[in-house]
């Protein structure tokens, strides 16, 4: 009785182990191809990985994941020749491309050809016999370049030999290898978009291809390093001529503007002095931006919004979508327990919670008594998303003297479940948002080591707790505070009202709608940090918000929202991408990252 059951178990084990082995091989292939061809974007230009079952003559048979080729024709005359092309052409972004073919059996006569061909070349021929077809043949060692007449090139090859084919897309040449040794240049002036190709002609011929599935016999990586050095030397020796002084001055200005953009205050000042330049933004302004960036990157969004409103009074009023984005991020930081409003609720909610001016206050919130340690005079209406009622000329304070008690696990479970979500999430969320990114990834996370804010204030008692804690051993919603959770839910209602107001005033925006829904979705999970939307709680998500706010502030000073250095890097990257699309192989060895030290 146990026989059939035991047999099924054995078969299942074989299948599972076979799948695991295939997955491991695929992983190794991907790693090797990424190492060999780092400049290739396979989403745009896939690499050849096997022979194509759709692009071959009928006398060709494929097996072993379309890597083994065998001949199944009559093999009586040259008209019985048959070839097969790879699945994709060789991308120019490879710079140097290489594949190998092992002769498993030479068959009856060993009439085998290994090489390249363009799309559309006749597959009823050996590679090299027709226009835009190139091959090295095993029976006579001749090379065939778009002609039925071969030229003496190398030794013959037979069973057990490994023949490699290397295409140099920089100088458009091709050379072959035999058992790991180069045979020299075979073809020059090659056209672009060639496919690896192999052809057979007599019964019994069998060959295996290696497109990177296994380590190559020939040391192609050493050859690639040689060409990388050549290309980088050409870049280093690029002539500047008589404009060297002008070139140097331009680079210095780009570096200076980059330091100013990211608020590297002391460094920017020292660099400007050493290069005899003027800083085109007041030192106080740089330090103000530095302070705001630090607050955003540490998750203290409420204080960041408040400080922005104090230092740049009309900025957020003129940019309601920016304000909305900041407040959505503040809600996320509330869930995370990092925003100051939920970390320390002993004092008044910061003015950061003040609203989009002129909008109706739709929800009442509990008012917290302010302490007298610090006050700011402001000129804004604060009507919703603020936690307290306020008016023009209101004096606000935000020193937080005590932190609220924690909530028990069962209570947290209820608020993290569906009931908590229904309190906030509305099916009528309709709004818009600006894109987070500037087009160039910029991080200001190191921009706070130099200088200090001229608008700096005394630290609140809970400030030490507001810094990002990446080693939290017990993560709880809003830090586990019942009062904080209630405030977070209230803030969510107010944020919903703000979105509806924006929709009425500015029309629908699917991006804004998605942003708010994603943020509210965090409450659908008992452990939002390990949920499908938990990526929002990662501190790295603060960086695009910080960059967008920083750019908006710079624009108020008529300064570029992106530093010229970042734009130049982006342009260089786009040029390399264009070179790849137009067949210039040198782009493979000219990575922008190689020059960022």
Swiss-Prot record:
InterPro entries, per the entry: B30.2/SPRY, B30.2/SPRY_sf, ConA-like_dom_sf, CRA_dom, CTLH/CRA, CTLH_C, LisH, SPRY_dom
Annotated spans, Disordered: 343-375, 389-417, 437-475
Topology of the protein relative to the lipid bilayer: Peripheral membrane protein
Keywords annotated in UniProt: Cell membrane, Cytoplasm, Membrane, Nucleus
GO biological process terms, semicolon-separated: cytoskeleton organization; retina development in camera-type eye
Entries under PROSITE patterns matching the protein: B302_SPRY, CTLH, LISH
Compositionally biased region (Polar residues): 438-456
Comp. bias intervals (Acidic residues): 459-468
CDD domains in alphabetical order: SPRY_RanBP9_10
Domain LisH: 247-279
Annotated ranges, domain B30.2/SPRY: 29-216
Localisation per UniProt entry: Cytoplasm; Cell membrane; Nucleus
Domain CTLH stretches: 285-342
A single GO cellular-component term on record: nucleus
Family assignment from sequence similarity: Belongs to the RANBP9/10 family.
Protein task: May act as scaffolding protein, and as adapter protein to couple membrane receptors to intracellular signaling pathways. Acts as a mediator of cell spreading and actin cytoskeleton rearrangement. Core component of the CTLH E3 ubiquitin-protein ligase complex that mediates ubiquitination and subsequent proteasomal degradation of target proteins.
Binding partners and assembly: Identified in the CTLH complex that contains at least MAEA, RMND5A (or alternatively its paralog RMND5B), GID8, WDR26, and RANBP9 and/or RANBP10.
PANTHER family documented for this protein: RAN BINDING PROTEIN 9-RELATED
The protein, known as: Ran-binding protein 9
Species of the source: Danio rerio (Zebrafish)
């Amino acid at each position: 009785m146990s026989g059939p059951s035991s047999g099924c178990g054995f078969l299942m084990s074989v299948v599972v182990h076979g799948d695991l082995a295939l997955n491991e091989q695929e992983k190794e292939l991907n790693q090797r191809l990424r190492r060999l061809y780092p400049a290739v974007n396979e989403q745009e230009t896939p690499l050849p990985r096997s022979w194509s079952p759709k692009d071959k003559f009928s006398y060709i048979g494929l097996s072993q994941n379309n890597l083994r080729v065998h001949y199944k024709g009559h093999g009586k005359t040259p008209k019985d020749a048959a070839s097969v092309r790879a699945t994709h052409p060789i991308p120019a972004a490879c710079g140097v491309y290489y594949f190998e073919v092992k002769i498993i059996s030479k068959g009856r006569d060993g009439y085998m050809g290994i090489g390249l061909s363009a799309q559309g070349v006749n597959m009823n021929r050996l590679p090299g016999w027709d226009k835009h077809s190139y091959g090295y043949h095993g029976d006579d060692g001749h090379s065939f370049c778009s002609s039925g007449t071969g030229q003496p090139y190398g030794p013959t090859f037979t069973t057990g030999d490994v023949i490699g084919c290397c295409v140099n897309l920089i100088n458009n040449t091709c050379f072959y290898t035999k058992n790991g040794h180069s045979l020299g240049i075979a073809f020059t002036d090659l056209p672009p978009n060639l496919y690896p190709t192999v052809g057979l002609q007599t019964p019994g011929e069998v060959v295996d291809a290696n497109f990177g599935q296994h380590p190559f016999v020939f040391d192609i990586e050493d050859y690639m390093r040689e060409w990388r050095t050549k290309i980088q030397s050409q870049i280093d020796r690029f002539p500047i001529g008589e404009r060297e002084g002008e070139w140097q001055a331009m680079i210095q200005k780009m570096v200076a503007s980059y330091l100013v953009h990211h608020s590297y205050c002391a460094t920017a000042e020292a660099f400007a002095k050493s290069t005899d330049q003027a800083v085109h933004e007041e030192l106080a302004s740089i330090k103000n931006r530095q302070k705001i960036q630090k607050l955003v990157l540490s998750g203290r969004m409420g204080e960041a919004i408040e400080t922005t409103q104090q230092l740049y009074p009309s900025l957020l009023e003129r940019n309601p979508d920016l304000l909305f984005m900041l407040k959505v991020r503040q809600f996320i930081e509330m869930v995370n327990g990092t925003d100051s409003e939920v970390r320390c609720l002993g004092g008044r909610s910061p003015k950061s919670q003040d609203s989009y001016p002129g909008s109706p206050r739709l929800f009442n919130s509990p008012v917290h008594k302010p302490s007298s340690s610090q006050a700011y005079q402001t000129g804004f209406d604060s009507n919703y998303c603020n936690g307290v009622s306020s008016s023009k000329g209101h004096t606000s304070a935000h020193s937080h003297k005590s932190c609220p008690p924690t909530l028990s696990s069962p209570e947290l479970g209820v608020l993290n479940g569906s009931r908590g979500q229904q309190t906030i999430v509305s099916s009528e969320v309709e709004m818009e948002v600006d894109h987070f990114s500037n087009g160039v990834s910029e991080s200001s996370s190191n921009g706070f080591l130099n200088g200090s804010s001229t608008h700096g204030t005394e630290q609140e008692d809970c400030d030490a707790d507001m810094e990002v804690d990446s080693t939290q051993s017990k993560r709880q919603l809003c830090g586990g505070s019942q009062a904080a959770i209630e405030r977070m839910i209230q803030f969510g209602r107010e944020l919903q009202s703000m979105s509806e107001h924006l929709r009425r005033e500015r029309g629908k925006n699917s991006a804004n709608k998605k942003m708010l829904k994603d943020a509210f979705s965090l409450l659908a999970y008992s452990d939002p940090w390990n949920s499908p939307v938990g990526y929002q709680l990662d501190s790295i998500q603060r960086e695009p918000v910080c960059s967008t706010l920083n750019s908006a502030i710079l624009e108020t000073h008529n300064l570029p929202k992106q530093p010229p250095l970042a734009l130049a890097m982006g342009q260089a990257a786009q040029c390399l991408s264009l070179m790849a699309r137009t067949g210039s192989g040198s782009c493979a060895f000219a990575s922008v990252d190689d020059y960022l030290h």
